[in-house]
């Protein structure tokens, strides 16, 4: 009697699974694609499990659109296994934004394929990958010339309403890039040295009286962790661009945040001031003008 009940229960489970599978397979294909792509965008592990549900899902999960939306956060940035590398390559061919950023970063800094790397980074930045915007923007600024202004414009897209929030996010980007760097770079990386050499410091309009440090805790605007990457003029220049362009377009809230600037008599020591103090007069007046034009 017990054996009979067990067999009956097992048979019922198999039938219910078969019925569920048949119901899913009967859904329109475009709906299956949307389900698969949304699942993949949230978790790579989840889409792997989805492939086991039915033959239809296994086939749909191989669609280019699903690969385009896949989240790659569960995969190491520089995959050493051949299967993982092939998987990333397939994602790149599907124009997956995260894969494009990885490909561009590796091409530019490790493989020394700068032109191709910049193309991938540009596409990833255009598709909304913030880390790609950060790296691509800084590279363009370093290269100078006509690309410099474009670099500032790209970096301005990651700026938040509050300056302190912006600094925190830039710090986060910096450490993310630094972590990637430790994965495959070495101390005498020639590409980074070329970027440092290529950057031409231009005297900003405030004569560097505004020595804004975009990274808090007395740490300057370092490109890849080296204190000599960029000098104060570039930090000042970027700060001027942020406060003369972005806020006037946004017009949502007052400029706020901690401002670090160089002491006049002790240039190697940095002090925290109240917002808008220690600034060149023209910049300070511009900020006052803006803050009066908006309501908090």
From Swiss-Prot:
A Pfam family it matches: TPR_27
SUPFAM superfamilies documented for this protein: F-box domain
Ranges of residues in domain F-box: 21-70
UniProt feature coiled coil, ranges: none
Name of the protein in its database record: Putative F-box protein At1g67623
